[in-house]
Design a protein with these regions (language model features):
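N-terminally biased helix-coil "hinge/interface" segments that flank
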Residues: 1-400
């Protein structure tokens, strides 16, 4: 494979999806090239390394020299998103104010469609027996109404330890005005050393709205171990291979941040991959003279839609990912767990379904010739003639 890029320093962007990993390199003259390889769901960092090896082969450069000449290295990842969509996160324990343990499951008590009484909500991330109440109360003005009982926290720790909890979320009433109780609970959790991963709502999302704050903190705890393990390992691999600049992560709001911040707040990465599309849409809009566009990005696991109106893409602090309600600054993207690699089937009632499980980096027993009996959306499009067999992505992948 040849490439048109020639002269360092390099600017590198890499996006890891559930199915493919895409690497974009820009050289000092602004020339760009794209490299696509299959992702490695068991270790997404291997997909990044594989894409880098492909690029280095095209450039005829040793890896260490290439990475050493990188001006910056920006990474967008759907690891957090796919962890949530596919239900493959950590076992989470939740500590909440006594009397409010069911807020996470009760949600707002409202349905988006008042006439739809049958569509279930997504599974609650923390089962009731792992939602443990803590005596103590902070009032809306920040004053202490009832003293905190740390013995409740220690009792909950025993339950969490016995059940193998991997990550703990703490969300107490009105902690966004006074975090003293949450700070004390977090200190006990660190002393008890049940697990490494602790998410405290007053650190993650110190805003009004008990349900949304609790939901956001629970999601953060749910995806944290997998995301942190991935990012830490990837950064160390890149450093060992010669990267001298910082690894930056693209956030849901379209900005970039270092790993130090995001390892503890991975909820800000839920739209890390698709938020990069905002820049592409704005660039395209300027080129064709259009200020109103709709962008739809269908990956292997999810589908992301965003709207540009009058040349601007909205930023929101209210986000819903697969019906999990979150409060985190993000590009106004709407995401559902349905992509090209989504597995379809027939349920016990004889009804057709698609998702939420995806085929990962081996999509399609028919489309990609990997064998198996579980068809995906891409298989259906190929069999129905909506997609043509043959090479795609510059010949890096081929549909049978």
């Amino acid at each position: 494979m040849t490439t048109t890029i020639q002269s360092p320093p390099w600017r590198v962007g890499v996006d890891v999806g559930g199915t493919f990993t895409d690497l974009v390199i820009a050289d000092s003259e602004g020339r760009t090239d794209v490299f696509k390889v299959p992702s490695v769901p068991a270790d997404p960092g291997e997909g990044v390394i594989s894409a880098l090896k492909t690029a280095c082969a095209a450039l005829d450069q040793p890896m260490a020299r290439f990475l050493g000449d990188c001006q910056f290295f920006l990474h967008g990842s759907t690891v957090a998103t796919n962890t949530l969509l596919e239900g493959k996160g950590a076992k989470v324990g939740l500590l909440t104010t006594k009397g409010f343990r069911d807020s996470l499951e009760a949600r707002r008590g409202l349905r988006k469609d008042p006439w739809d009484h049958r569509t279930p909500y997504p599974p609650v991330l923390v089962p009731r027996y792992l939602r443990q109440p803590v005596t103590g109360r902070i009032a809306a003005d920040g004053s202490e109404v009832e003293a905190l009982n740390l013995d409740d926290v220690r009792a909950a720790c025993k339950i969490f330890a016995d059940d193998g909890v991997e990550s703990i979320a703490v969300s107490l009433l009105n902690s966004f005005v006074n975090s003293a109780h949450e700070d004390a609970v977090a200190e006990v959790l660190r002393e008890e050393n049940i697990c490494e991963w602790i998410s405290v709502s007053s650190d993650i999302v110190p805003v009004m709205g008990e349900y949304e704050r609790t939901s956001t903190t629970a999601v953060n705890a749910y995806v944290m171990p997998r995301v942190a393990s991935y990012l830490t390992a990837l950064q160390q691999k890149l450093i060992d291979m010669g990267l001298k600049t910082k690894l930056l992560m693209l956030q849901s709001n379209g900005g970039a941040a270092s790993l130090d911040q995001l390892i503890r707040q991975p909820v800000n990465l839920l739209l890390s991959g698709p938020s990069a599309g905002v820049g592409a849409m704005q660039h395209l809009a300027a080129g064709i003279g259009e200020n109103n566009l709709v962008s739809m990005e269908i990956g292997g696991t999810s589908c992301d839609v965003m709207l540009m109106h009058d040349g601007r893409v909205a930023i929101t602090d209210s986000l819903s990912v697969n019906d999990y309600d979150l409060v985190t600054p993000s590009v106004d993207i709407h995401t559902v767990g349905a992509g090209g690699g989504t597995i379809a089937g027939i349920d016990a009632a004889g009804l057709m379904y698609a998702g939420p499980e995806g085929a990962g980096a081996r999509p399609g027993p028919a489309a990609y010739g990997h064998g198996g009996t579980r068809p995906t959306v891409t298989d259906a499009h190929l069999v129905l003639g909506r997609m043509r067999p043959g090479p795609y992505a510059g010949g890096s992948v081929s549909l049978d």
